[in-house]
Amino acid sequence: MNIFPSLMLTSLFTLTLPIIASTLNIHKNSNTPHHMKNIISFAFIISLIPTMMFIYSGQEMIISNWHWMTTQTLKLSLSFKLDYFSMIFVPVALFVTWSIMEFSIWYMHSDPHITQFFKYLLMFLITMMILVTANNLFQLFIGWEGVGIMSFLLIGWWYGRTDANTAALQAILYNRIGDIGFIMSMAWFLSNMNSWDLQQIFTLDPNHTNLPLMGLLLAATGKSAQFGLHPWLPSAMEGPTPVSALLHSSTMVVAGVFLLIRFHPLMENNKTAQTLTLCLGAITTLFTAICALTQNDIKKIIAFSTSSQLGLMIVTIGINQPHLAFLHICTHAFFKAMLFMCSGSIIHNLNNEQDIRKMGGLFKTMPFTATSLIIGSFALTGMPFLTGFYSKDLIIETANTSYTNAWALLMTLIATSLTAAYSTRMIFFTLLGQPRFPTLITINENNPHLTNSIKRLLIGSIFAGFFISNNIYPTTTPKMTMPSYLKLMALIVTILGFALALELSLATYNLKFKHPSNPLKFSSLLGYFPTIFHRLPPSMGLLASQKSASLLLDSMWLENILPKSISLFQMKSSTLVSNQKGLIKLYFLSFLITLTLSLLLLTPHG
């Protein structure tokens, strides 16, 4: 076996050691979370070796097969696809999870079930690794369902809270809708191609792939919270902050985008699928950016920004640039995890206060967290030479120079501008101005578990984009021929967003509105989506069932058994009685006439 898969699989199997140790039940102590964190850091360091060797060797793909089972028509094997996507993604995911695990030791220290929480986080990571390295649809489906069930368990971690239970159920139900598309695609590939192996599917390259690609797009819509199946993502903020950080950076939500990236050889020749993907991504990125503008919960602002960035990744796949979408997944993981961890630090220090209107002035009291939050927000907006710039700027450039839908491009540019606006708003309310929280709150951000984890991601948010984009192929970019205004478009719309946000803030600083405007209602009520989809159908269903039940009871049983049955019996009997008048003379006369006529007719004549 080649050294690449050997080392990579060693780092992946290292992750299973804490799970195996917990089942053996050798010893239970309070240091288990520390051991798990150390094991993930060890796995990250091991995974760097095969990744660097892979990058510099130039080998495209290495697959390791272990025969699993054979049915009458299908051969299933455990097959790991260690190609460009998985080899780059695994170290990024391990690095981010290592930081989140260390942050969790500080954030969840008072939780009595912290060891169980860490096992769930580790299982979450393992299932994502299965999904990323899978070479057949069955294995990919195991990872796909794994991240779904682990997200359910982690979002509903504080099961004593009704909102957490509702959010966990919402996440699993929306993902079920997406899973229908995935299973439909699996069934199509099995019935038409008799294979779930990715190489065989791409080699055969069927002509009519609209149906399976629509199924895969539906699956990605559910998992990556695209427009229509997006409401579960902001609701998922009911879970602990480390869960939000892991869910939004390198696991669950990027799984849908990763699925479409995996199937890009089929998508690149299908105009229908690409147009739908482009339009879906454009609608999502704009809609969620508008929703983020007026939110007051700090975690929900960051959650909507995640959904907006996922929409941008889907747009990138729609313009047939899967490698760029993948680059954005990798760079986005660093600063998004850091933003959530900074918000967790603020929430924890302010006694679980999440409303940005009740914060303010934190730049002086929490300088390290504030600095990290500002750098993370700048990286999110695509500020030059931070991590986000290396992928986001390229995406906007490529969209500008592509032969693509102008409407989708315009929506993407507006969403990019709004990203700067809501990031500025979050910084303005949270860190600047006078403190608006109670004076007796003790603020302490000096715990090494907190500072070390954020420091690592801070370094990643500044330098990771540079290192990743310079080490992945093509290492030499061909000369671009585009006008300067197209080259600077991403920067122009971002600066415009910053300027617009500050200008509107200053212009409306002393204004008071008695009634909220319609755009404000649309944004703060999330486009009326939860109201329409979560309130109307249940209320209509309840009303219809209540009416039908009452009608059935009243009309069919209560009325028919007593009042209607008595009246019906009386009418029938009265009709029967009134038909017999008792006129005996008339009866005898009619009998006599009938008898006489019959005798006359039947008597033979001589």
From Swiss-Prot:
Keywords: Electron transport, Membrane, Mitochondrion, Mitochondrion inner membrane, NAD, Respiratory chain, Translocase, Transmembrane, Transmembrane helix, Transport, Ubiquinone. It holds the Pfam family Proton_antipo_M. It is a multi-pass membrane protein. Its main location: mitochondrion. One of its GO terms (biological process) is electron transport coupled proton transport. Its EC number is 7.1.1.2. It catalyses: a ubiquinone + NADH + 5 H(+)(in) = a ubiquinol + NAD(+) + 4 H(+)(out). One of its GO terms (cellular component) is mitochondrial inner membrane. The chain crosses the membrane at residues 1-21, 38-58, 87-107, 114-134, 140-160, 171-191, 213-233, 241-261, 273-293, 301-320, 325-347, 366-386, 409-429, 457-477, 488-508, 582-602. GO terms for molecular function: NADH dehydrogenase (ubiquinone) activity. It comes from the Eukaryota. Core subunit of respiratory chain NADH dehydrogenase (Complex I) which is composed of 45 different subunits. PANTHER family: NADH-UBIQUINONE OXIDOREDUCTASE CHAIN 5. Belongs to the complex I subunit 5 family. Core subunit of the mitochondrial membrane respiratory chain NADH dehydrogenase (Complex I) which catalyzes electron transfer from NADH through the respiratory chain, using ubiquinone as an electron acceptor. Essential for the catalytic activity and assembly of complex I. This is NADH-ubiquinone oxidoreductase chain 5. The lineage of its organism: Eukaryota, Metazoa, Chordata, Craniata, Vertebrata. The gene is MT-ND5.
